[in-house]
């Protein structure tokens, strides 16, 4: 894997030689066998005469290389790059090659549908994987037009960035085939080009944009999955997104069509290929899902649409400005949801519960980095698709918009798009427009917010007189060791009082916070409320420390706060105090169990269940862990039983109970649910919930391999195969664990998605069953990192890291990190993040008294 790297210095040097890439004409023959396919490419580009460079191409074999009419030796190709000597001022390069299909979700992924045996293909190119499909100058600033010609079996469809211009049917050596010809694209980076091919089915619609242009819309999925696709919901969200973005940006949608395709075994949530967006199939709901997942799908739809402007129309020059793509798309998607969709009421509460929780966690790891990160090479950027680039960046943008004003912000974006359409930008290109429209010193703001790392803590310091009126109120700002930056914050202080059983806001103060101590003069003389909520409305990006009186009010009445955003701020503040070892873990467990039954925001409920699980596994003192887990599972069962029938809460609480099942009595309830002897009103044991029960019963030794095989026979679908892998790997026997250790760590035979589920199964159950694999993990992981693809190795590095946070594991991990060579920086980062988790867990365990 490291041999496939490209450094920033190499990219800069190549861009100085390649003056302009004009066009690619790419022919792909996708009728070939399951291992390789044919790719022929013609590239026209200008270069420094007499210079030499290289083109990226991860190939099975190279048949021919022709540069300006001269046949070059195929020895110039090493399977990763093709050297190009003695360039002319104007060049025509023709290459014929065979490329590999993958089962890792990188390059051109090949999937066989178990339901009907049909073959489906899709491309995934970000960051550096268009080179797995055709020879290409794989860096974002070498833009060009791309014209695709694709030959496929006659019953397939092909979708790309542009509309097809014709389809030719021919009788070929291996049967009838169709060749699809597509219009050339506008100038774009290679990583947002796309090819999706197979017997996909589609549903079509259209919209008329702000220019009066009719934009064709399409939603695609596998034949066996299409009955579950909610195309109307996708179209509704797409129309709402188009309307909002074109109005805000004053810039029309830049492409000719907008297709959205659900593709199998996709690694990410989605990918913003220009006019041809791909999504993971988890967003097709064949069973009932939490409303949190429906809202996540909506945010993802809006996120990818925002990328058509941020990233596709205007692209970062190099990957250090990846945030110009991702932070903006993340922020704009929530803003669009809040202002122009049915998710308006809950959008920012969801953002608080999901994105900001992710950001705060990532920003407190040793691997944290500025939003504008230092990216030395591709290995750096591949591990920087993280909570800083996405979630912190979006959080900070929200802070910026509150500071400069939304109208000024959007006006700056219009000029930015006008100036840089189809080009590449750096940070300063945006800052100059923001300063012009707002009159603010945005560069100084950027230096503190975008170019430094770490999260500040804002703590309330309040006193009142004998009458209960506030006599002093200050906000004290601090920073973590090693991150000595105090930042400006725009924030709201909410005054909440109990009114008719609800904690209701009765007053608010909006202010700028800066420096070590900000005195809030406006609060003096006001009645001290039951809850003084700093960062109400969640504008600021900071850890929040409430005063003791407010903490006690929150613990007793968290579920009674009538604002979902305010509840989210309180949930987040209390979670931070646990993670920082300032609240005993068992007290937090009680807090969650006493309040989640009243939580109405689906994503907040999901987040608190996840935090509860992490606390039970890692933060509760070891001597109290089993008893606390038993008690928590019992309480989750009680909450599920009394939840409103057929409600989101009922489903989430039941799934939480299933995942926390420990005792024989608890397993009995799971067994009876599976067998239909026990029912909850309004609850249907549908396909996915049935598999949840199967996986847990397998973990408890109550479901055999033979029974799993029977379940798979009844649900031999992509979903069924994934769940079956998890169930098999969950069986609590040495033989089952050894079998899946071998499949994951040794043979590498599993596809990306099957491996993901298998890892979850392998790690389930009693930790002593897999403790024997702790040392082999450290012995094998560097070899896996060096030999497997990025996506596969990242799954294994994080997923197979030893489970139990102990002092021995911390010591072993530190020793391993010290032994790693300098060229293993990306591996070091992933292991160091796992180490950070162990160190934090031990600190929190020690405080759980």
Regions found by a protein language model. Give the residues of each.
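Hydrophobic alpha-helical and helix-loop surface patches within well-folded domains
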Residues: 182, 211-214, 218-482, 614-615, ...
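Surface-exposed beta-strand/loop patches in extracellular or lumenal glycoproteins
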Residues: 42-59, 138, 147-153, 474-494
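Extracellular ectodomain segments of secreted/surface proteins
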Residues: 23-50, 460-466, 475
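Extended, low-hydrophobicity, Ser/Thr/Pro/Gly-biased non-transmembrane segments
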Residues: 3, 15, 98-206, 374, ...
């Amino acid at each position: 894997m490291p041999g496939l790297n490209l450094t920033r210095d190499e990219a800069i040097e190549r861009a100085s030689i390649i003056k302009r890439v004009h066009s690619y004409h790419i022919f792909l023959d996708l009728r070939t066998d399951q291992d390789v396919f044919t790719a022929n490419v013609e590239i026209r580009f200008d270069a420094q005469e007499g210079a030499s460079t290289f083109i990226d191409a991860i190939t099975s074999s190279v048949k021919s290389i022709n540069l300006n009419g001269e046949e070059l030796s195929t020895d110039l190709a090493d399977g990763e790059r093709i050297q190009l000597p003695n360039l002319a001022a104007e060049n025509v390069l023709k290459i014929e090659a065979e490329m590999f299909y993958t089962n890792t979700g990188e390059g051109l992924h090949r999937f066989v549908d178990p339901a009907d045996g049909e073959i489906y293909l899709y491309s995934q190119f970000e960051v550096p994987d268009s080179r797995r499909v055709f020879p290409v100058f794989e860096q974002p600033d070498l833009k060009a037009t791309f014209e695709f010609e694709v030959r496929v079996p006659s019953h397939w469809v092909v979708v790309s960035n542009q509309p097809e211009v014709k389809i030719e049917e021919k009788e070929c050596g291996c049967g009838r085939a169709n060749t699809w010809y597509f219009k050339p694209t506008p100038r774009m980076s290679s990583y947002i080009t796309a090819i999706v091919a197979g017997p996909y089915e589609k549903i079509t619609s259209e919209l008329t944009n702000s220019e009066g242009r009719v934009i064709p819309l399409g939603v695609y999925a596998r034949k066996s999955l299409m009955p579950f696709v909610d195309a109307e919901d996708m179209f509704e969200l797409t129309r709402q997104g188009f309307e909002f973005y074109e109005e805000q940006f004053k810039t029309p949608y830049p492409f000719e069509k907008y297709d959205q395709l659900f593709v199998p075994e996709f690694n990410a949530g989605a990918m913003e290929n220009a006019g041809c967006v791909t999504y993971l199939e988890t967003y097709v709901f064949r069973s009932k899902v939490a409303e949190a997942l429906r809202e996540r799908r909506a945010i993802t739809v809006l996120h990818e649409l925002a990328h058509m402007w941020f990233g596709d129309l205007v692209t970062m020059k190099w990957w250090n400005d990846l945030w110009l793509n991702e932070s903006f798309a993340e922020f704009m998607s929530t803003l669009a949801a809040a202002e122009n969709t049915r998710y308006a009421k809950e959008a920012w509460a969801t953002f608080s519960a999901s994105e900001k929780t992710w950001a705060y966690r990532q920003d407190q790891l040793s691997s944290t980095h500025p939003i504008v990160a230092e990216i030395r090479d591709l290995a750096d950027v591949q591990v920087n698709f993280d909570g800083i680039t996405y979630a912190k960046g979006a959080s900070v943008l929200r802070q910026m918009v509150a500071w400069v004003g939304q109208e000024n912000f959007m006006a700056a974006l219009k000029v930015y798009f006008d100036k840089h359409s189809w080009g590449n930008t750096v940070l300063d290109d945006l800052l100059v427009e923001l300063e012009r429209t707002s009159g603010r010193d945005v560069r100084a703001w950027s230096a503190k917010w975008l170019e430094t790392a770490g999260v500040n803590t804002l703590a309330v310091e309040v006193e009142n007189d004998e009458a209960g009126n506030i006599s002093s109120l200050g906000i004290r700002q601090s920073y973590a060791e090693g991150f000595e930056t105090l930042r400006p914050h725009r924030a709201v202080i909410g005054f909440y009082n109990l009114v008719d059983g609800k904690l209701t806001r009765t007053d608010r103060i909006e202010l700028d916070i800066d420096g070590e101590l900000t005195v809030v003069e406006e609060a003096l003389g006001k009645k001290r409320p039951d809850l003084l909520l700093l960062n109400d409305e969640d504008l600021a990006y900071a850890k929040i420390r409430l005063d003791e009186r407010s903490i006690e009010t929150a613990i007793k009445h968290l579920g009674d706060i009538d604002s979902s955003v305010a509840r989210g701020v309180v949930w987040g503040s209390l979670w931070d105090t646990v993670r920082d070892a300032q609240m005993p873990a068992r007290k937090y467990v009680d807090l969650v169990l006493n309040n989640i039954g009243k939580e109405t925001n689906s994503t907040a409920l999901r987040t608190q269940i996840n935090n509860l699980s992490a606390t039970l596994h890692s933060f509760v003192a070891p001597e109290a862990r089993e008893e606390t887990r038993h008690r928590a599972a019992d309480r989750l069962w009680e909450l599920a039983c009394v939840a409103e029938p057929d409600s989101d809460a009922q489903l989430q609480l039941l799934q939480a109970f299933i995942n926390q099942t420990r005792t024989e009595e608890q397993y009995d309830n799971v067994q009876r649910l599976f067998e239909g002897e026990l029912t909850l009103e309004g609850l249907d044991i549908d396909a996915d919930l049935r598999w949840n029960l199967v996986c847990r019963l397998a973990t408890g030794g109550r479901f055999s391999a033979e029974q799993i095989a029977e379940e798979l026979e009844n649900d031999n679908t992509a979903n069924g195969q994934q769940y079956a892998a998890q169930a098999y790997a969950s069986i609590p026997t040495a033989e089952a664990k050894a079998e899946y250790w071998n499949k994951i760590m040794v043979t590498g035979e599993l596809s990306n998605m099957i491996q993901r589920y298998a890892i979850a199964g392998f790690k389930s159950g009693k930790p002593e069953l897999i403790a024997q694999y702790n040392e082999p993990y450290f012995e094998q992981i560097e070899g896996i990192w060096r030999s497997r693809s990025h996506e596969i190795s990242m799954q294994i590095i994080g997923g197979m890291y030893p489970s139990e946070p102990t002092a021995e594991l911390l010591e072993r991990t530190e020793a391993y990190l010290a032994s790693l060579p300098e060229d293993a920086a990306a591996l070091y980062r992933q292991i160091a993040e796992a180490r950070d988790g162990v160190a934090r867990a031990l600190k929190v365990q020690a405080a759980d008294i």
